A protein has these predicted regions:
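Short alpha-helical segment that forms part of, or immediately flanks, the ligand-binding pocket
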Residues: 42-46, 67-76, 89-91
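Nucleotide-activated donor-binding/catalytic signature segment of Leloir-type glycosyltransferases, i.e.
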Residues: 7, 11, 20-46, 53
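Flexible glycine-rich beta->alpha loop in the catalytic core of nucleotide-sugar glycosyltransferases
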Residues: 60-61, 68-71, 79, 84-88, ...
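Acidic donor-binding loop of glycosyltransferase active sites
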Residues: 47-64, 78-81
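A short, well-ordered alpha-helix in the C-terminal region of glycosyltransferases
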Residues: 109-112, 116, 123-138, 147-150
Length: 155
């Protein structure tokens, strides 16, 4: 690219109405991308764990709550570049210092956040470790289910 970064590989997991458009764009711009389509959960997790950075590209206005894939990112122990507008997730990502929140639909902010994590291995590793801690504290079903039961029982 124009900044001299040429050893990035993007792995796009999942499917959607713009998949073909993204594939064409990546080919036209000569971006190293692997488009997997939908994967079985186990395959997705294995591939996710091999990644250095996760990008959570949620369409503006889409997700009103914390979605399952952010738990997968956290469990994988990788930092997140987050475009999701959900305040709960933005705040928890910030509190745990587990990634970078960017303005939804700001491609420049997203690219800059990826570049920051790419260029600074120390931050990338620290944010990944923090995200794993987030998974253990907030997304571990054994812990969270017990908290739900206690709340229901009024304890």
């Amino acid at each position: 690219n124009e900044k001299g970064i040429n050893n990035l590989k993007f792995i796009i997991m999942g499917d959607g109405p713009l998949k073909e458009e993204f594939e064409n764009y990546a080919e036209e711009k000569k971006v190293d991308c692997q488009f997997t389509g939908r994967l079985e959960y186990e395959k997705m997790v294995g591939l996710l764990c091999s990644c250095d950075i996760a990008v959570n590209p949620i369409k503006k206005g889409s997700a009103g709550s914390i979605i399952n894939k952010v738990g997968d990112y956290a469990a994988a122990g990788i930092p997140v570049v987050n475009t999701q507008e959900n305040l709960e997730y933005k705040n928890i990502l910030e509190k745990y210092n587990a990634g970078i929140n960017v303005k939804n639909e700001s491609f420049i902010d997203t690219a800059n956040a990826i570049e920051t994590l790419y260029n600074d291995k120390r931050i990338r590793i620290k944010y990944g470790e923090n995200n794993r801690k987030l998974a253990e504290e907030k997304f571990d079903r054994k812990k969270t289910y017990n908290q739900i039961v206690k709340t229901i029982e009024g304890n």
